[in-house]
Amino acid sequence: MIAFCTHDPEYGFELWCLDVEERRAWCIAPKLRLNSVCGDPFVWLSDSKRVVAKFVIEDVELPVKNTVPTGPIVEESSEGEIRANRTYQDLLKDEHDVALFKHYTTSQLELIDVRSRERKKLGTPLSFRKASPSPDGKYLLVDIIQEPYSYLLPASRFGHSVEIWDTETGDVVETVATIPLQEKIPLAFDGVSDGPRSIGWRADVDATLYWAEAQDGGDPNVDASVRDAVFTLPAPFNGLPRRLLSLAWRYAGMIWGDDNTALAYERWYKTRSIRTHLLTPGGDLETALAEGNGPCCGRKADPSQAEALNRLLIDVKNWEDRYNDPGTILTMMNERGKPVIRLVYPEGNKPADGSETVEPSFLVQCPGASDEGDMPYLAVMDTIEAKQQIVWRSKPPLLENALNILESDEETGLPKRLLLKRESPEENPNLFIAELPEDLFENGEPQITQALTAFPHPALELKDVKRKIVTYEREDGVKLNASLFVPAGYDAARDGPLKMFMWAYPREFKSATFAGQMRDSPLRFNRLARTPLYWLTRGYAILDGPLMPVIGEGDTEPNDTYVEQLVSSAKAAVDYVVKEGIAKRCVPRRILSKPVLDPACFLCRV
């Protein structure tokens, strides 16, 4: 079954369910509006029979603003800690904004059987950020926004409490953490709050919490050998947490597999580096009982439990280097609807339950970037040296992407059928089912067995336009590239220069070498969307996405020479198209940080 929302602009969101086999849809909660202001408005339980949904409180009127001032607006600076902070837009401005925020974020949690439509209220109306069920469905991890709010910070930094509720009754089982207003986060990349964060459920077991916590006060400028640690705590949540892993860099996520396999990511923004650790998390172990009734995350770790065995698996020195991108390790949904690592055993030695541990392999998906453009592929990665063996790859003249694995071999876990998206510059992306050859490592050709869609070209007037990825250099030697579009049938030698749009946006880099790498494919469909390509029908040329890298190598910050580099990149693009005879300068002067407008030029007048 599929649960989904319908939206009526005059009413709001309603919750519906679709039985695919019966081909029947029905409204689960008639005359009740979902609250989608914060987080997902509903979530399935693992039994696939019930959902937990957030509903609007219908009998509460919208706060009305008092047009008569109650007094002057006073901003007071009292004694306290001096710290730098970012500036944000669209913040709460007065008491009426506070009342509106509370009104729109407040909702009622309800447990609903999707077939019988039986509903049960859970707890009282609160400002819920999220409600996440445990894999076994017995508990809800509930995140609640707390007052007082702030006039200086966005809602994502408001104080909040995290609790575990009983799914059946809505009773509070344990308080996980009480997190204050996040006004002391260091103003630096990799600066984080000093306390628990990224609280969630371990996906491969019944009900185990995990979270990360800074060990350096959240300040990346402080010298520390351990910056973050990951902790776990199993149900019934009355014990001491286990310190699962210590990290030298900033925690960047976890993917769970089973008791023997999990992945932990750490990153360091200053060097654009990310590392992947392979660890053996183990099962849920009994822990010493906690003394008192403090929040779960406030308890000291159980000293009798050792950290998980782990080793470095992937070390990405600079994530800006697309040509050496190791790819993304694939996950799959387990029987409880939670994402876990997709483990494969190419030798067919998948262990039976209770047998000795066999080292698994992973499936990875990679963009396959190179100077010729992206050529996506799937590969098997061993967990010893992270070496890859390609099992499927996109090949010209089409650009293909594997969207999902539809069927896997029962013995090896290797893919047998794929859901592919195929496209070309002239062909709209469409979906196909592909059967992979029996011996994946012999590079046999996949067989397309079924076309699922046949979307036509959305604008036949633009089907024959020409697109070419062009390369050129900036004054400082940085290699740049862009997508050049010209009208159908255009010949520069015959037709002369055209008027041209350049559609660009700058981006920061730490490496000049990686800044000029190809970040697209010449085989990609010429999408329209919100682009200037429509002007091709009026005889314009388009230089789409010319690289505008702002580079700060070493200790240099990109913004130190932002304007100079931006001007240099624009000048290089203009010089290229003028040299090739595709366009000409409408103003016979050099490019400046302040534009010089030509009153005779249509675009300048606009």
Which functions belong to the PLM regions below?
Residues 1-447, 457-464, 514-517:
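Beta-propeller folds
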Residues 137, 146-149, 204, 255-260, ...:
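Serine-hydrolase catalytic core recognition
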